[in-house]
């Protein structure tokens, strides 16, 4: 079995191939997320504590957190599940995944160093791989450099030196910096005030329209009521005229 060990403190990772089955027994029947003391792997691993992060079996199927078995299962997955990337909106698919319990059928086991031991491991703990990209969000930059809200974040952006072009080695060095997101500037505040002003304007216009409509509706109801009363009055007077004329035309005995 191969052990893919990473050390977040240095940013390094290294692949170790372990042939001896007895050394690997410390990982068997352990779940993903469990922390294991790695003294049994060899003298150089004395004092190290490793966390099981995942793995793949010999057919390439990945381990999935929360599936409490050491065999392979087929699960119906949708957007948001690990081990699955939907190709269309709302797509669901039944995929084969391995359970989160480690056994001998795995080909690669992913491990993370939680606690460093006594000795250095060449290529893993002795080197340092700097991050290629710095933080992009303003609050993350403030957190990284311990800045207050009054400090200017733009001065602390992590820039990356671009390689010089052929024939322009003596030119001025060029840097590439990310565009800071969620940065509060006077322009942003102005836009925010403009949006609030538009919102208030729309609200006032809507209230005015509602009031105008209510007035028009009341006027229409009043006009309809007056017309109905006039119609009833006209009918009543017409019926009274008809009754009087019928009384006059009736023969007297």
UniProtKB/Swiss-Prot annotation:
Coiled coil: none annotated. Ribosomal protein S6 is the major substrate of protein kinases in eukaryote ribosomes. InterPro entries: Ribosomal_eS6, Ribosomal_eS6-like, Ribosomal_eS6_CS. It is found in: Cytoplasm; Nucleus, Nucleolus. Keywords: Cytoplasm, Nucleus, Phosphoprotein, Ribonucleoprotein, Ribosomal protein. One of its GO terms (molecular function) is structural constituent of ribosome. Residues 226-247 have a biased composition (Basic and acidic residues). It holds the Pfam family Ribosomal_S6e. Residues 200-253 are annotated as: Disordered. One of its GO terms (biological process) is ribosomal small subunit biogenesis. The keyword Nucleus applies. The keyword Nucleus applies. One of its GO terms (cellular component) is cytoplasm. Signal peptide: none annotated. Component of the small ribosomal subunit. Part of the small subunit (SSU) processome, composed of more than 70 proteins and the RNA chaperone small nucleolar RNA (snoRNA) U3. Belongs to the eukaryotic ribosomal protein eS6 family. Component of the 40S small ribosomal subunit. Plays an important role in controlling cell growth and proliferation through the selective translation of particular classes of mRNA. Part of the small subunit (SSU) processome, first precursor of the small eukaryotic ribosomal subunit. This is Small ribosomal subunit protein eS6.
């Amino acid at each position: 079995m191969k052990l893919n060990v990473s050390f977040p403190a240095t940013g390094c990772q290294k692949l170790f191939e372990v042939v001896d089955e007895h050394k690997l027994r410390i990982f068997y029947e352990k779940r993903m997320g469990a922390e294991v003391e790695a003294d049994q792997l060899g003298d150089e691993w004395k004092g190290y504590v490793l966390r099981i992060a995942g793995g793949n079996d010999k057919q390439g199927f990945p381990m999935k957190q929360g599936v409490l078995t050491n065999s392979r299962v087929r699960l119906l997955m949708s957007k948001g599940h690990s081990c699955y990337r939907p190709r269309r909106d709302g797509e669901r698919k039944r995929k084969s995944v391995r359970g989160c319990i480690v056994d001998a059928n795995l080909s690669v086991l992913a491990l993370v160093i939680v606690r460093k031991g006594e000795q250095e491991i060449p290529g893993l703990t002795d080197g340092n791989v700097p991050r290629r990209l710095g933080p992009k969000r303003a609050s993350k930059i403030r957190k990284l450099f311990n800045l207050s809200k009054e400090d200017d974040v733009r001065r602390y952006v992590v820039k990356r030196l671009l390689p010089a072009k052929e024939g322009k080695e003596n030119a001025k060095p060029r840097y590439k910096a990310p565009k800071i997101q969620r940065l509060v500037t006077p322009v942003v505040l102005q836009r925010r005030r403009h949006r609030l002003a538009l919102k208030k304007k729309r609200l006032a216009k809507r209230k005015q329209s509602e009031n105008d409509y209510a007035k028009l509706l009341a006027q229409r109801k009043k006009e309809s009521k007056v017309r109905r009363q006039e119609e009833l009055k006209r009918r009543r007077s017409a019926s009274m005229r008809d009754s009087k004329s019928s009384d006059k035309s009736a023969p007297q005995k």
